[in-house]
Amino acid sequence: MFKKFLSALLVSSLWLSGAAMAQTKQIKVGVIFDMSGPLAAGGSNASYLGTKYAIDLINERGGVEGHRIVPIYVDAQSKTEVAINETERLLNQEKVDVIMGVFSSAQCVPMAQRVDQAKKFMWANVCVSSAVFKDKNLRNVFRAQVHSDQMGEASCRFLGENSKAKLGKEVKDLKVAIIYEDGPYGAGVASGNDLVCKQLGMQVVLKEGYAATSPDLSPLVTKLRRARPDVILHTGYNPDITLFLRQAKEQGLKWDALIGHGAGHGQFDKLFATFKDDANLIMNVDPVAAQLLDPKTLRPGMGALTAEMIKRYKAEVKADEIPTHVSMGFNQTWILLSDVM
C-alpha cells in the first residue's frame, strides 16, 4: 500500500506536464551533493558517485519504463546556503521533476521544506536527521534512510549488550560521554544517545556540542579528561573528527571505546591513512555497506548490482576500501528508480 501511495504521488508530480513528458521521454532529476569543501571527503562525494552509478545503470537498461533519466548534478560546496539556492534554481529554472541526493542534514532540513512548499518531489538519499520530518507533516518528501535518533539508539544498545563481556563493566557502572557537532545531524544522534543510554542505566558524564567548523577542540578534550568516560559517543562530519582525534592523542585522552555515527567515521581509508593502527580502536554505526551483505539473502540480481557498483567505484577512485556512503547513494537511488517510479 505504501509503495502504491508513493508511486501515485510521484506520478502526479511527474506528469503535470504530461504531453511534453510523453514526447521527450525524459525525467529531469536534480542531484545535490557536496563534491567540494570539507563534507566531500566526509562521505558526500562517495554518496554522489554511488548515486551516479545507479542512474547510469538504469539508463543503460532502458530507463524508467522507457523514460531516460536526465540528471543535473550540482555541487553544494559544503555550504547550506548554496544547497538552498541551487534547489530553487533546479526547481524554477531547470524545471526538474525530482530533487534527490543530499548528504548534509543541515542542508536537508531547509531543502525539504522548500521542495514540499513547491509541491515537487524530493527523495533524500543520505541525510539522516530526524528533524527533516519530525512534526513537519511533509507530503512530497521521502527518505528510505535510517533516522538520526535510531543511530543514537543503536550505539547505546550495542554498549548495553557488550559492556560486561567486552569492557568488564556492568551497564550501571559504565560512564559515557556524548560529543557531537551541533547541527541537526549531530544533535539528532546525540538526542538518541542521551535518551537510550540513560534508559539502559548508563552514567552520562558529559554531553557537549560544538561547531563543526571549530578550529580548536582542545577545550572539549580537556572536559573529557576531567569527566573520565569509559566510552565516547561521537557524531561529527569532517574535518572536525580528524581534529578531535589528533588533539585527543596530543593531550593523552584515554578511553575504552570510541563509537562514531557515520560521516567521517565511515571513511576508514582516510582514518587509517591519518591515524594508522589507532584507527583500529574506532567503531562506527552506519547502514551496512552492500558489499558486506550475503547476496544469497537478497533479492535475485542484487549481488550482481553490488559487484557492478564496486567495480565502477574502484575503477574511478582507485581505492580498495569502499565506504558505506557509496552504497547509500546507490541503494537509495535504485529503490527510487526501480521500485517507486
Could you say what each language-model-derived stretch is?
Residues M1-L9:
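Bacterial N-terminal signal peptides that target proteins for export
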Residues L16-A22:
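Sec/Tat signal peptide C-region and signal peptidase I cleavage site
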Residues T24, Y48-P71, S163-V171, K198-M202:
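Signal peptide-proximal N-terminal region
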Residues I27-K52, V74-E81, F103-S104, I179-G188, ...:
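Extracytoplasmic "Venus flytrap"
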Residues G42-S47, D56, R61-D135, A144, ...:
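Beta-alpha junction/loop-to-helix N-cap segments that form part of ligand/metal-binding clefts
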Residues K249-F330:
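Extracellular/periplasmic periplasmic-binding protein-like sensory domains
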Residues Q332-M341:
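Extracellular/periplasmic bilobal clamshell ligand-binding domains
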